[in-house]
Amino acid sequence: MVKGLEKFNELVESFANLPTIGKKTAIRLAYHLCINNQIDGMKLAHNIENAIRFIKPCEQCGALSENELCEICSDKERNKNILCIVESPKDILTLEESQSYNGLYFVLDELNEEKLEKLKQIILKLNISELIFALTHSINSDATIFFIEDKFKGLNLTFSKIAQGIPSGVNLENVDLISLNKAMNFRTKI
């Protein structure tokens, strides 16, 4: 760090603390905002402040929201009978971008009694008929799915999870063995 440039150094450090931003990129960003484009820098600072002040978890599903209920939970056009369980609000953003799902969500960022009770109340209140698990494939997620399925087996639900296998455009030699095994065992007829 350069002596006499404490504010610049603090900005570089703040950028470097963000995921996927290394020190060189942090320096480039700080320089760009302080020297090349101060207007963008002020706009960025304002947008960051507003996001921190106004974005919070949806009270029902845990998605990012500026209101008590997010746009998804408030949308009357959504399929209210299907609930997709995800690990984080970022997963909702990804699924929404894919435009492949039109139901509701529930963020299960941690498995505890409070979360399970909240999930159960949503299932009962909305008369959910299917839970879709869209969790990162791991032994822990398989255990979580099994646990929730066992806990809610008396609620007349259908349980499913998103398909896993080989990503498009990836050579077989580059696929991990678990994904390859899943792809073979859950193959579809053509």
From Swiss-Prot:
Give a Pfam family name.
RecR_ZnF
Biological function: May play a role in DNA repair. It seems to be involved in an RecBC-independent recombinational process of DNA repair. It may act with RecF and RecO.
Which family does the entry's similarity section mention? Belongs to the RecR family.
Q: Please list the GO terms describing molecular function.
A: DNA binding; zinc ion binding
Q: Which PANTHER family match?
A: RECOMBINATION PROTEIN RECR
Zinc fingers, C4-type, are found at: 58-73
One of its GO biological process terms is: DNA repair
The uppermost taxa in this organism's lineage are: Bacteria, Pseudomonadati, Campylobacterota, Epsilonproteobacteria, Campylobacterales
Key word Lyase present: no
SUPFAM superfamilies according to UniProt: Recombination protein RecR
Q: Which InterPro entries match?
A: DNA_Rcmb_RecR (IPR000093), Rcmb_RecR (IPR023627), Rcmb_RecR_Znf (IPR015967), TOPRIM_dom (IPR006171), TOPRIM_RecR (IPR034137)
Q: What species does this protein belong to? A: Campylobacter jejuni subsp. jejuni serotype O:2 (strain ATCC 700819 / NCTC 11168)
Gene name for this UniProt entry: recR
Q: Which UniProt keywords apply?
A: DNA damage, DNA recombination, DNA repair, Metal-binding, Zinc, Zinc-finger
Protein name as it appears in the record: Recombination protein RecR
Q: What are the residue boundaries of the Toprim domain, all occurrences included? A: 81-167
